[in-house]
Amino acid sequence: MSIQPLHPVGLKSQAVNFQLMPPLSLYIHIPWCVRKCPYCDFNSHEAKPVLSLSKGGSLPEKEYVAALLRDLESALPRVWGRRVQSVFFGGGTPSLVSGEGIAEILRQVRMLLPLEHNAEITLEANPGTVEADKFAAFRAAGVNRLSLGIQSFNDQHLRALGRIHSAGEAKRAIAIAQQHFDNLNLDLMYALPQQTLEQALQDVQTALEYSPQHLSCYHLTLEPNTLFAHQPPLLPDDDASSAMQQGIEALLAGQGYAHYETSAFARPKKQSRHNLNYWQFGDYLGIGAGAHSKLSFHDKVIRQARYKQPQAYLDAAVQGMPVQSEQVLSKEDIAFEFMMNALRLNNGFEEVLFQERTSLPLLLIRHELDEAEKRGLLQRDGQRIAPTELGQRFLNDLLQIFLAPEH
């Protein structure tokens, strides 16, 4: 599907004029990992040998932390005075960084930005790169939410995914994490190579034995420019993967997890605040190699991208010039991107949120909304707009309504 912004009648005559700035989050990218997974299309680069610098490893932690902080300093004029509600360390594998490195980053973040006192601070970790003392150090540094990339508890499937950890290591990592964190997310994947419905449900059942506060269950997709795209494995067909999805949703609903976004399930009040800000079209400042930003001003919305290659980023960041590209979003882009994000939420969004986050009147997409409702993909009650169950199942078809015709 070619994604183009929508072009509703009258949109071009509307001016962007924000009266209230959206909530702001901070994303920090750590680009290194132990081994690139064959399905991964994120900006990640293998670091060999993977040891901490104190043990003679190759990860340039000290230099990268300095570059991140210089990056943040250079971005301050764009976010001056705005409070940060969440911080997210993503990758790559952020848990490759030492506890001291994470602590230094967060120390400087607190000095440079007004961080909310109850800010959600998440760090992604892989079971194969964690030790008990590291978890304790991350918690002491100020991280209050851990996201573990489990993917599966089946050793055969872990090998097929190119993961470096075993099922036993995954279980050990969860047990250690729960000694230090009371807000834990587990990432799982389904529709894996040669996976059966029973195996997919068993992965979720095993995760439930630990009662995590949050579960993310992702359908494996073959992304361009990945090893799996070039050498596709044998995957379950559409009917089988759909049965897995429905079975997972039913199992988690029965255990009290709210299915609040396409792939996200949470205990009450344990939704990912950081990701919710993305889906509700909030602002985010991204620092680090390849990080993206979306920032609103009174008269415009901009997107930025940092240099992707770690060395290019390091060289540019220390000079205070980490941004490789920047664009001002058109009003068409703003309206479309809001819908593309907000319609991922199962409960949708309040109508007033559209104008708050885009500065555009909802009236401008009334024809698209009418069409989606007529096709049974969308429901409205005068206050809230949300995808129907059919719209959730066929989200791409729903989004297609808000895309411009291809030329």
Give names to the regions the model predicted.
Residues 359-371:
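Short amphipathic alpha-helical interaction segments
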Residues 390-407:
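Short, amphipathic alpha-helical interaction segments positioned at domain boundaries
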Residues 384-388:
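Minor-groove-contacting beta-hairpin "wing" of winged helix-turn-helix DNA-binding domains
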Residues 31-44:
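Local cysteine-cluster metal-coordination motifs and their immediate loop/turn environment
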